[in-house]
Regions:
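Domain-level signature for proteins that mediate thiol-based redox and metal-cofactor handling
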Residues: 257-351
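N-terminal catalytic or cofactor-binding beta/alpha core of small enzyme domains
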Residues: 1-144, 149-256
């Protein structure tokens, strides 16, 4: 048994930092806050996949107990708002889900959308970020494992997989985990099946890809974990394939100097994070792209260090941001304006 901390939007299990393991469950619950009633739906709809991932919460808690990891889980149905979607994703709040009209979502205004984001979406992601920050802040490289489940059939077609391993750009956990699971006799394991792991703005994109943290999404077929016996079986199976990554230092930066390919990957991570950062900034919509390398340069330097999984000196991180030594960048791009330039500026800003 594990102790579960509960607040309005999140269930949280405080694990052991030395495990490095952070378990996530985006679609853990099928409940709604009382103020929303049933969103106009029949009770039976909340027992279906459109409301939550059947069995995923139980597997998450089982793994937290078995491996000593942290766990962050949602407390409300994805029908209210989907935590595994970016804020600009049209499926963030579904008016129609698998052929079912959701009356309570059909005509919500921007104010209600912002309310749901603030109360039920943002706190979940904040708790994930806090958990990861606590680890990286003391030099621990986290491992993120996100637990989901999928239906045995879709649109009348059976799905042959017992489980699927989903991933986007980071295969540090996914590739070897697929091999480990496929080594078990009779087990059919999908590689980015039944879904693709590439979803811009989803939970793992936000907390894994953009931060350079090793991560993987595990989908288990719902009928296999609908009962306790199945949950127990899959907890043991997944624990066996997760444990090696907890012990082998996955996500740690090698001691050797980074080669150009690694630097490029880190730079790409930092700039993807910059894009997400700029989307949140209403004051930089018309930013001059010629000044992009100089804008938020301290943030970029910090993100580069974080993405590397090891300490980078501030000067080295800045050099990677600017493409040259900081002093050289200042000499080229932060020169004092001449008297003529200042006069022209004053003239152009007179009303």
């Amino acid at each position: 048994m594990v102790k579960i901390e509960v607040d309005e939007a999140v269930e949280f299990v405080a694990g052991l930092p030395e495990t490095r393991l952070v378990l996530l469950c985006d679609h853990a619950a099928n409940r709604l806050p009382p103020a929303y009633g049933a969103l106009g739906l029949a009770a039976k709809e909340f027992e279906r996949h459109i409301a939550y991932d059947i069995g995923a919460r139980e597997v998450t808690l089982g793994l937290a107990a078995r491996l000593g990891g942290f766990a962050v889980m949602t407390r409300h149905s994805r029908l209210l708002i989907d935590p595994n979607r970016g804020l600009d994703d049209p499926t963030l709040i579904m008016a129609l889900s698998d052929g079912v009209i959701v009356p309570g979502n059909a005509a919500i205004d921007e104010a209600e959308k912002r309310n749901r984001i603030a109360r039920y979406h943002a706190p979940y992601h904040a708790r994930i970020a806090e958990t990861l920050d606590a680890m990286t802040g003391v030099g621990t490289a986290p491992l993120i494992v996100s637990l989901h489940s999928f239906t045995p059939s879709w649109k009348g077609k059976s799905r042959p997989w017992h489980a699927g391993i989903l991933w986007d750009q980071d295969g540090r956990i996914a590739r070897p985990m697929i091999e480990l699971l496929r080594a078990e006799p009779g087990l059919v394991v999908g590689d980015n099946e039944p879904y693709s792991g590439a979803l811009d703005g989803d939970t793992l994109s936000r907390h894994g890809t953009l931060r350079g943290i090793a991560h993987v999404l595990v989908e288990v077929r719902q009928d296999l974990i609908a009962r306790k016996s199945g949950v127990d079986e899959w907890v043991e199976r997944l624990a066996r394939v997760i444990e090696p990554f907890m012990k082998d230092g996955t996500n740690a930066q090698p001691e050797a100097a980074m080669d150009d390919a690694i630097k490029t990957a880190i730079e790409a991570t930092a700039f993807r994070r910059l894009i997400a950062h700029l989307r949140q900034r209403s004051d930089v919509q018309n930013i001059d792209l010629m000044n992009l390398a100089g804008f938020c340069r301290n943030c970029l330097a910090n993100w580069l260090a974080e993405a590397a999984g090891a300490e980078l000196s501030r000067d080295e991180a800045r050099r990677m941001v600017y493409g040259m030594a900081y002093e050289e960048w200042k000499a080229k791009h932060q020169t004092e304006a001449s008297a003529t330039q200042k006069a022209a500026f004053e003239k152009s800003h007179k009303h």
